[in-house]
């Protein structure tokens, strides 16, 4: 028993290449040997190979078996050797698989996908809700979460966790930030507002300099807590700044004056409601905002803004610029028709 245990330990310590080479050699040579020992029973190489494979991987079918003493002795060797070879291979594959799962859970595996969204930071409810809403959207397929936690705080097939400091280029490389669609920076939890915004600013400037290094513009959205810190972020070239605490204050104040308005806002922001806010590009046949407004309205949607300019409703005859980013309110089916260039029947 001790002999077989030591033999198994030695085989397990073999390099993968050595083990594969040894296994292939065993399966190649064994049929030749059994053919030499019992040429009548194993008249072809294929019959010998079939017997070796069945003997080492199953209990045997009994269609081919050695009948002479030398054949039986060799058969015994094949059984034990095959048992250790197959057992070692299975053990090594299992070990690699368990190691892969552990590395993925601990955020030590690099992400090599493209067109993903990167979320930096973690807080239980806020970011969980954000991820839920993003994954409910058809345009979001994969999310990479960067945080300094011992293991992934969320288990989902579309979420890849990276453990590391977001202010280090190595971490951004591992998350493949250069080929992401956008980076979302959440304010750190449990930190006073003046320090939290400082950390967010440091991350934002790191992403900006990283983008210059890889020669790509990285679309960045940052959550900040204090309005008087807005000016500090101008130099960081953050594409969108969200005042999280103030947004809630505005919503509550508006709801108290215009009762029921909060439900309207929440429905437009949630991916679970029927009508949502979408972004579309300008069509060639749309010259003025009125052209776009009328066609979009006829299809059952509503044009509300170009970028952050909501005054276009009062300027219907203004020519739409080529770089227009038109925001509409529509259900999913209507949005698909508009974005795919659906033509209205006259």
What spans do the regions from the language model cover?
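Hydrophobic alpha-helical transmembrane segments of multi-pass integral membrane proteins
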Residues: 24-29
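Pore domain of cation channels
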Residues: 30-33, 41-106
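Cytosolic regulatory regions of ion transport systems
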Residues: 1-23, 36, 65-66, 70, ...
